[in-house]
Amino acid sequence: MPVPPPPPPPLPPPPPPLGAPPPPPPSAPPVSTDTSSLRRADPKGRSALLADIQQGTRLRKVTQINDRSAPQIESSKGTNKEGGGSANTRGASTPPTLGDLFAGGFPVLRPAGQRDVAGGKTGQGPGSRAPSPRLPNKTISGPLIPPASPRLGNTSEAHGAARTAPPRPNVPAPPPPTPPPPPPPLPPPLPSSSPIKTPLVSPPGPLTKGNLPVVAPPVPCAPPPPPPPPPPTPPPLPPASVLSDKAVKPQLAPLHLPPIPPPLPLLPPCGYPGLKAEPASPAQDAQEPPAPPPPLPPYASCSPRASLPAPPLPGVNSSSETPPPLPPKSPSFQAPPQKAGAQALPAPPAPPGSQPFLQKKRHGRPGAGGGKLNPPPAPPARSPTTELSSKSQQATAWTPTQQPGGQLRNGSLHIIDDFESKFTFHSVEDFPPPDEYKPCQKIYPSKIPRSRTPGPWLQAEAVGQSSDDIKGRNSQLSLKTLR
């Protein structure tokens, strides 16, 4: 209330100066008489300026306008209507508009507190007041928006339950370390690297649901947990399978060691993480439940970072009947092929040689182990960038041994190969050999003394012609050398 009154006071001071200018043309005394008469006869104002000044004085006197506006805007509307009528009759509406703006502004602030009443009335108010009601409405919608965000979260949970999933991955993750006392060391490294651990547990979910894999690939980096929520029913199987896998891994690995040697080339790529071996063992433990294969995709999800681990496996995975449908369903190319590979070749993934290798690879995957395996392939692939044939030969040489591993660990190399595979390059042999370089004396016109003697212009012209001839000769020589 005290704040609104101050604005009107400034208005009164201007009236005297404004009143003063009109009187100056006549004599000084008549000025006072005119002002007094005008003040006495309000409706009969001689000039619009005087009428405006008088209106301002009235507004100043009626400081209660602020009080009227304070309770509700309707009162201010009534005052506006009255003032507007008087202003129209007098021909000056500017001061009342200013007063309305001030009065409307203050009540708008008050209704902000009263969202319900102020919202409707402010909406009825003039355009200047309308924005303020919109703000309260927005504030009301603001609370609604937060629920919307939870709804979005719910939708995300329905699609991937990224936020809710984390607790689930955490829950299954703790059990695996506890059940197998010997393997606990292996899980700890994975927990140390949260991203890796989460993918192990979370990927199973996305794999179980073909639609979710889309969310899984983007999520694997930060929130791999989303996939697990989708398969609430299978999750018990995956945790049990994971626990049983970890507990039985030692047994499974020795059992499948004989088949391991042949698949080793394929396994090393998957084995570099050592995680793939684990998924394979789950598949072996329980091939009936689809949950065990999902664990493999988690590693695949980790491998997707390599970006092309799957392509090598699809050929091998095609043999398995069930895997083929899965790969088409899941947009993530890497995860489905690995699933197929796990199902088709449960023994090969499990047999990365022996658990000691798995442990080493697991420890190495976050850090040195994987890096050591992959770096060697990188230089050969990059060194012969100029010659595709040599590169392809080297790539083939690497493929039997560590091609998948290199692809999984070092996705950049594989990406480079794919990028170059999109284009066809000619080998150096396809191009004709360059002509032999024959040293020849070149004559440059700049070195020719232009004016041996200050002769006539004809000599200069002759020199110019000779320079042109020399240029032509040089160009021909250069072309021959280039050919």
From Swiss-Prot:
Region annotation (Disordered) ranges: 1-414, 461-483
Origin: domain of life: Eukaryota
Segments of skewed composition (Pro residues): 1-29, 166-192, 215-239, 256-271, 289-298
WASP-binding motif (motif): residue ranges: 424-448
Subunit (UniProt): Interacts with WASL, and monomeric and filamentous actin.
Record-linked InterPro entries: WASH1 (IPR028290), WH2_dom (IPR003124)
GO annotation terms (biological process): Arp2/3 complex-mediated actin nucleation; cell differentiation; endocytic recycling; exocytosis; retrograde transport, endosome to Golgi; spermatogenesis
Motif annotated as RLRK, chain positions: 58-61
Family classification: Belongs to the verprolin family.
Cellular-component GO terms for this entry: cytosol; early endosome; recycling endosome; WASH complex
Free-text note regarding domains: The WH2 domain is found in a number of putative actin-binding proteins. The profilin-binding motif has been implicated in the interaction with profilin and SH3 domains.
Location within or outside the cell: Cytoplasm
Modification type Phosphoserine: residues: 149, 202, 383
Motif (Profilin-binding motif): 3-8, 11-16, 20-25
Official protein name in the record: WAS/WASL-interacting protein family member 3
PANTHER family: CXYORF1, WAS_WASL-INTERACTING PROTEIN FAMILY MEMBER 3
Lineage: Eukaryota, Metazoa, Chordata, Craniata, Vertebrata
Pfam family, one: WH2
